[in-house]
Each structure stands twice: as C-alpha cells, then as structure tokens.
Amino acid sequence: MKNLLGSSVKDLENVALEYGQAAFRGRQIHNWIYNYRNKKKSIDQIEALPLDFRKKLKDDGFKLSELSVQERNLANDGTLKLLLSANDNESIECVGIPTEKRLTACLSSQVGCPMDCKFCATGKEGLKRSLKASEILDQILFIENEMNRKVTNIVFMGMGEPLLNIDDLLVSIRSINKDFQISQRKITVSTVAVPKMINKLSAKSFQILGNCQFTLAISLHASNQKIRETIIPSAKNYEIENIIEDCKQYVRDTGRRVSFEYLMLSGVNDKLEHANELSNLLRGFQCHVNLIQYNQIDEVEFQRTSLKSLQSFQSRLSHNGIAVSLRKSRGLDKNAACGQLRQNANHQ
C-alpha cells in the first residue's frame, strides 16, 4: 500500500519522474489532493494526469485514501462526528466542530488508547494500533468533504495518546502546515503526559518541523499526585511535579505557553482547596488552564460538577493570578464531546 496523502511536492515530483513523467505531474497530484480537496479519492480520477500514468499508479498500489465513512452523526449544534473504517476494518472517530468563522477538526492519533483514563470512553477498549500519518490527514479531508468547508483549526484530542505515536504525529503536523496551509499556531496537541516525551516532543519538532509553534495541552485533571493516580492510572509512572518541570523546560525551549486541561469532577477535584493547590503548582511560568465540564459516558459513575462550584473554582484561579477559561463542550447529544469518542459504532 502506497498512500500519496502526506507526501511533499518533492516526493510527488520524484514519483512522477520514476514513471517517466515530467516533474510537474507530481505538482498536479499535490494540487489535486490539497488545493482542490477533491471528493474523488481514486488515483484514476485525477483528470489532469495522462490516463496511462493514472493506470500505472493504480496498478502499482498507489492510493489517495485508505479510509471510508462507516457512520455519520450530526449533533443539534452542528457538530459532526464521523466513524471511519480503515483497510484492516478498525474504526476511527473524528469530529468537525463548526463556528461562524472556524471549522475545528478533532483528530484521532490511534485506534483506541492505552492510557485507560477512568473518565474517558476511548480507553475502555484498549489500544488496537497507532495511525499512520496518511490516516490522520485523511480525517481532515473527510470532515471537509462532509461539511463542505475548509478546516481552519486542528486539535489532537480524539482517540489515542498522540505522544505514543510521535513520528506520525509530527509528519502529519508538517503536512497540515505545509500542504493544508494551516498555521502551527492553530494546531493543539493534547497529551495525558508520558515520561520523557514532553522533552522529546520539543526536540523532534525542531528536527522534523524546523520549529515548534503548535500548542501543547496537558490533560492534568488534578491538583496533586494522589488524585491524579485515582483517575489516570498511568500517572503512577510520572509524578505531577515532574510533569510541571518538564513543561517549564518546554516553555524555555519553544517560547510557547502550555495549556492545562482540567476536567471538573464533582467531589473529586472541584473544591476551592484544589484550586489553591493547582495555583501553587502552576504559578511562575507561561501557562493557561482550560476548565472542562464532565461529559457523561456509560459504565462510569463520575458526576459533572455544579455550575456554582465551577464558577467558584474559576474565580479562585483567576484571583490567584492563573490564566483560566471555561471550554464549552460541543456535540453532547451525539457522544461527540470531550471524552466520549470510542471505536465501536454500537455506542453512538
């Protein structure tokens, strides 16, 4: 299988030359994929190419897509969740989140997830495999084709732990930036935090991308190690203080502030003492806290914190000098919101 999605202009020019074609034929393929964002996903439909060239590419196994739409779910607020099927019959979920001026694509980086966060549906079925860069990028094209508009923002907040698929993650970010023409500053990578991988992310970003301008979002969800271990089992391998130190180094290396995701769970992490503890943990470096309301999933007994507690928590962080905002959930009625994605069509 040779997927052309994610290939650079130079790569595609080389493909053309290998088949005895002029280099500009490679640029025509690139334009077909990225500039036109064409719904025609077969090599033999690239009308700008000579028929015999198209046939040879197809016969030799070249493809523009390895995914197909298995299911569509449109929420009342316009959010679209797609269940995509890969060649190996594994399922991938992605979400298109529209506003008047933006279309945000929430992308998956793995089939399933190994982190087993207790509040998240994705990890309930474990990790099947990591996605190839082409499969990550194809999610953008499917969202664009289904919603008939171009994606403007990217969040890696779908299925999987992005830093456990770091090479394909960064290759896809490079293509999103260079080929899809989406600024790195409009890309967010969310991670539950994996030992040594925050430092590796900044180093490999400079190596593969030449810089590191996307936003790093840490799924912290706790103000101390004890609470974090109860809701995120993998936290036992990565002390919360070490995460913060690695984030401070990340800021020094990249010049970019870090975002911290904080899921408000009633009676677990939503008291004012937790807000004060979180303030002490984060004080003194460039960061921002996103408070997230819990979205109910099956088989989990956590409850959403009250609006009063949420507002008090937000006010306390702000009073303590911590930049904070409340992230609005989208697509709740179709299980397309934060923490609700899973690979099984039976859970729609």
Swiss-Prot record:
Binds 1 [4Fe-4S] cluster. The cluster is coordinated with 3 cysteines and an exchangeable S-adenosyl-L-methionine. S-adenosyl-L-methionine binds at G160, E161, S190, S219, L220, H221, N295. Pfam families: Fer4_12, Radical_SAM, RlmN_N. Residues 99-333 form the Radical SAM core domain. GO terms for cellular component: cytoplasm. It is an enzyme of class 2 (transferase). It catalyses: adenosine(2503) in 23S rRNA + 2 reduced [2Fe-2S]-[ferredoxin] + 2 S-adenosyl-L-methionine = 2-methyladenosine(2503) in 23S rRNA + 5'-deoxyadenosine + L-methionine + 2 oxidized [2Fe-2S]-[ferredoxin] + S-adenosyl-L-homocysteine; adenosine(37) in tRNA + 2 reduced [2Fe-2S]-[ferredoxin] + 2 S-adenosyl-L-methionine = 2-methyladenosine(37) in tRNA + 5'-deoxyadenosine + L-methionine + 2 oxidized [2Fe-2S]-[ferredoxin] + S-adenosyl-L-homocysteine. Its main location: cytoplasm. Its EC number is 2.1.1.192. Gene3D superfamilies: 1.10.150.530, Aldolase class I. PROSITE patterns: RADICAL_SAM. It comes from the Bacteria. [4Fe-4S] cluster binds at C113, C117, C120. InterPro entries: Aldolase_TIM, Methyltransferase_A, RlmN_N, RNA_MTrfase_RlmN, rRNA_lsu_MTrfase_RlmN/Cfr, rSAM. GO terms for biological process: rRNA base methylation; tRNA methylation. Disulfide bonds join C106-C338. It is found in: Cytoplasm. GO terms for molecular function: 4 iron, 4 sulfur cluster binding; metal ion binding; rRNA (adenine(2503)-C2-)-methyltransferase activity; rRNA binding; tRNA (adenine(37)-C2)-methyltransferase activity; tRNA binding. Reaction proceeds by a ping-pong mechanism involving intermediate methylation of a conserved cysteine residue. Specifically methylates position 2 of adenine 2503 in 23S rRNA and position 2 of adenine 37 in tRNAs. HAMAP family: RNA_methyltr_RlmN (MF_01849). NCBIfam families: rRNA_mod_RlmN (TIGR00048). This is Probable dual-specificity RNA methyltransferase RlmN. It comes from Prochlorococcus marinus (strain MIT 9215).
